[in-house]
Amino acid sequence: EYLSSFYGCTYEESKQITFKILYGGIPDDIAKSIPFFRKTKEYTNELWSKYNRDNFIETDIYKRKLIKKNYTDMNRSKLLNYLLQAYETECNIKTIIELQRYLYEKKTKLVLYGYDSFTIDYNNSDGVDTLKEIKKILERNGHLTKAKMGKNLGELQSIQDRL
């Protein structure tokens, strides 16, 4: 919503514009007029300098090294993209581990993970508190969630108000 006010468009449209700018490179005029992009461009330049100086960069959570010689066509935008994707993936790995530990002795199971979604096969015998705890796990670190339920993926209905 913050960026949609700068663009003068809807939230959904602003998401598309933002990703296009982030992953395609931040033009100087955008960086000058929108503080978020100014800071992002500064951060990207810092990452790029470190990557070129050290010949690698580490991911934030698991400290995996992206070694320069393994990426022949790397550029600033790609480096930022790779690190953002790595951060999201590594956060989700931690979330999956926490969910699996919580669900270990329950009949409810995590059955599918997609980039920004988790599909849970909920068993009524585990009780609604199980769903509430799953929601808490997913919302750690300030992540927002939407909860839906249905007999299959094509029939999902929101259950936000019940949690």
Where are these regions (language model features)?
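Conserved catalytic core of nucleic-acid polymerases
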Residues: 1-113, 139-151, 155-163
